[in-house]
């Protein structure tokens, strides 16, 4: 048994209001710079929809994640080593800029400089790539927000597989939910396996997946290898970049920027202990519907004396074990079985999990318009958001875990409503879903009224175990380019002119200001 610790995240989709605060703050802190204008390490999608980049869930097109061979051995869907190297100079499944969107700004200066005329001047869009004016903005990272666009395009959502999706195009049957997305910091990351330069690594102390900017050579195989498409190419520096899980904040015991600024308080951060020796076996499970349960078996109980003893022997700090015992992520994912992984069928064993949404369902149930099958709780299988859709998103098509999570959340609400409104303690609903009164009270505290220290339980890092960086910090500093010498190197493998900054406020062409 090889015990490792991982800082994981759970997002409660039942409380997400789609305000995009997490996206904006993450963008301002980490990717609001040249070469990364199109990149959003955190973005919020409206489901159903094809997402950002377009159709990112279609692995038949993008070849991300792992595939299980006949022998039971895992191979990147992109191909083995020989296959990856054979297309290193021309990757046929690399997303183009049009699959993301053409980043743009507006010609605000024209509002001040426009000559006096008959009509008010307007701020027209201008490309941040070419510097030219754009006739029309046709796509963006949140283009489908609030079900924007016609259903015919949103119906290409891969989560509609094995469903009669035509009926959900009708107004009476339509539904929506928000899905905040960031790098999953997987236990079995396919981006690490597909990088020819070996520049991507997973930190042992907290499981955060990072890209070594000095080793990265810009082959961009990691972009194709990542099934969640959360690695981006910086065209200015010629390097790949991704969400770093705000590791400078994590090291000091602070939550990530997206978690800190979340308006709905939907995010939970905590430590999980896992057995690294079980990863290959879990990811190689034959049936995709079993992957969720197999991943749960990888996690270790932090309250087990045998696990604690072995963890201390293997060098896991005591404060990390204490944090794992108080982890809200472990409670939501393992104790109560409410949180589920995003697309476990990719076999990467993701570590950012989601609580399925119940709010749009519960309002219908309260109206008494749903069958209850003779039980206290209504039949969640017949509610507005299709259970099969949520299962395709969160449990590889297996509706069992989704039904269990939804029923337990509904039972908690039924119990608390009878307690606060009717003044009685009705335990029939929670008994149906195998929950005790103590568990439900704790669930209510964490899901509804959790304090800051309940949602974020992050141990500080042990600097005494790290190498002394004093000789490096004065000469290197913090850069986003080619190591210590910034991003102005003239070296180019293909002997072509390097792309430099484009001044989008340059002199307008004749007739543009009219």
Region annotations inferred by a language model:
Residues 1-514:
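Non-ligating segments of multi-cofactor redox enzymes
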């Amino acid at each position: 048994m090889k015990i490792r610790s991982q800082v994981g995240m759970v997002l409660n989709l039942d409380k997400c209001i789609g305000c995009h605060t997490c996206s904006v703050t993450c963008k301002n802190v980490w990717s609001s710079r040249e070469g990364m204008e199109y990149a959003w390490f955190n973005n919020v999608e409206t489901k159903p929809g094809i997402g950002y980049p377009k159709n990112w869930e279609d692995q038949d097109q993008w070849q991300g994640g792992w595939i299980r061979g006949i022998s039971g051995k895992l191979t990147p869907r992109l191909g083995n080593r020989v296959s990856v190297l054979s297309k290193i100079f021309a990757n046929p499944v690399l997303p183009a800029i049009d699959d993301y969107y053409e980043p743009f700004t507006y010609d605000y200066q024209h509002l001040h400089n426009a000559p006096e005329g008959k009509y008010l001047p307007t701020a027209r869009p201008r490309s941040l790539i070419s510097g030219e004016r754009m006739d029309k903005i046709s796509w963006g990272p949140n283009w489908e927000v609030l079900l924007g666009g016609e259903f015919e395009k949103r119906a290409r959502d891969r989560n509609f597989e094995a469903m009669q999706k035509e009926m959900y195009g009708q107004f009476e049957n339509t539904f929506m939910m928000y899905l905040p997305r960031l790098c999953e910091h997987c236990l079995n990351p396919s981006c690490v396996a597909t990088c020819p330069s070996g520049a991507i690594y997973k930190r042992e102390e907290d499981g955060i997946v990072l890209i070594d900017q000095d080793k990265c050579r810009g082959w961009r195989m990691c972009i194709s290898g990542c099934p969640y498409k959360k690695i981006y190419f910086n065209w200015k520096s010629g390097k790949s970049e991704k969400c770093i899980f705000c590791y400078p904040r994590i090291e000091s015991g602070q939550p990530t920027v997206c978690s800190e600024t979340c308006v709905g308080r939907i995010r939970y951060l905590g430590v999980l202990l896992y057995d690294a020796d079980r990863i290959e076996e879990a990811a190689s499970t034959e049936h995709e519907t079993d992957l969720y349960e197999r991943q749960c078996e990888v996690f270790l109980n932090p309250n087990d004396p045998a696990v604690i003893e072995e963890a201390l022997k293997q060098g896991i700090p005591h404060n990390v074990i204490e944090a794992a015992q108080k982890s809200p992520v472990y409670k939501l994912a393992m104790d109560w079985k409410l949180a589920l992984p995003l697309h476990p069928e990719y076999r990467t064993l993701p570590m950012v999990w989601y609580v399925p949404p119940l709010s749009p369902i519960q309002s219908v149930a309260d109206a008494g318009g749903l069958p209850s099958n003779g039980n206290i709780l209504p039949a969640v299988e017949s509610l507005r958001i299709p259970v099969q859709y949520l299962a395709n998103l969160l449990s590889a098509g297996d509706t069992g875990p989704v039904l269990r999570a939804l029923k337990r959340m509904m039972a908690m609400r039924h119990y608390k409503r009878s307690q606060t409104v009717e003044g009685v303690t009705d335990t029939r609903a929670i008994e149906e879903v195998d929950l005790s009164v103590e568990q439900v009270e704790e669930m209510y505290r964490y899901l509804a009224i959790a304090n800051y220290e309940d949602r974020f339980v992050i141990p500080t890092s042990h600097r005494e175990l790290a190498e002394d960086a004093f000789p490096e910090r004065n000469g290197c500093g913090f850069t986003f380019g080619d190591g210590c010498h910034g991003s102005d190197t003239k070296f180019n493998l293909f002997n072509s002119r390097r792309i430099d900054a484009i001044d989008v406020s340059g002199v307008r062409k004749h007739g543009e200001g009219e």
